[in-house]
Design a protein with these regions (language model features):
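Transmembrane-helix signature of polytopic, membrane-embedded enzymes
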Residues: 96-103, 124-146, 164-165
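Extracytosolic helix-loop segments that constitute the early lumenal/periplasmic catalytic or substrate-binding loops
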Residues: 30-42, 46-77, 81, 89-97
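Short helix- or helix-capping micro-motifs
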Residues: 25-28, 140-145, 172, 193-197
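Short acidic/glycine- and proline-prone juxtamembrane loop motifs at membrane-interface regions
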Residues: 149-163
Length: 236
């Protein structure tokens, strides 16, 4: 009978360790989102009622009334993209289960945060792959996978997880555009910035890096038309 030996070095290569950290980080985020109610460690949730002025009310007004808040009071000043996606997720869950309880609908909205947090981890690994050695990528993924400030947002109702996703996406998109400044990458980057700015205004910060890369490559083919299309898509 052939003897089987477990080769630790062959199994736990640096690349496999990075993959393991990524999978572990995603499992942690999903587990936390499932077991933690939205009112625990939440931020600016307030009452689970359409008559309140917190993030829960923002979502519930979209689900129940089918429209954005009529004012910018308190948490109603937030950009709408995250809440539109969360309202869609909550409406789908309501349709599948028939449950119309406010707590259930608000908790269902966390699905967007959880998915965004997991995809943020993937995009972060892609960015680390661009700039770092495999050993440094391992350290970076360990920090991103298990530091509470990153995975807690995956179990909360709020735009933070989606904002981090778009920040990672636009930086990676800028890196890809610099390598291949074609129409496809220009339009994709513009869409990412447009959606990101509709999620949170702080997406303006990575724009400085993107502007620098654009300026470096201003002599590339058809630069002016690409920038015009980029502005038309991203700025509104």
């Amino acid at each position: 009978m052939r003897e089987y030996r477990f080769d630790v070095k062959r199994c736990f290569t640096p690349e496999n360790v990075v993959r393991l950290l990524f999978v572990s980080g995603c499992i942690l985020r999903i587990w936390y989102a499932v077991v933690t109610p939205v009112t625990m460690r939440g931020h600016d949730i307030w009452e689970l009622s359409v008559n309140a002025k917190g993030k829960a009310a923002y979502l519930l007004r979209l689900v129940e009334w089918g429209k954005l808040p009529d004012s910018y009071e308190l948490q109603f000043y937030q950009q709408p993209f995250y809440y539109l996606l969360s309202a869609l997720a909550a409406a789908v869950m309501r349709g599948l289960t028939g449950i119309e309880d406010a707590a259930f609908l608000v908790n269902a909205g966390k699905v967007v945060s959880c998915i965004a947090s997991c995809f943020s981890l993937y995009l972060s690994e892609r960015l680390l792959r661009e700039f770092c050695s495999v050993r440094v990528r391992g350290y970076g993924m360990a920090v991103l996978s298990f530091t509470p400030v990153f995975w807690l947002t995956g179990g909360r109702l709020g735009e933070d997880a989606l904002t981090f996703f778009f920040m990672a996406a636009v930086i990676l998109g800028t890196v890809e555009w610099e390598k291949q400044p074609d129409w496809k990458h220009s339009i994709l980057l513009a869409v990412l910035y447009g959606c990101g700015m509709m999620t949170k205004i702080s997406l303006a910060f990575p724009a400085f890096y993107t502007a620098y890369i654009f300026w470096k490559n201003r002599k590339s083919s058809r630069f002016i038309p690409k920038m015009a299309v980029f502005a038309v898509i991203a700025l509104p």
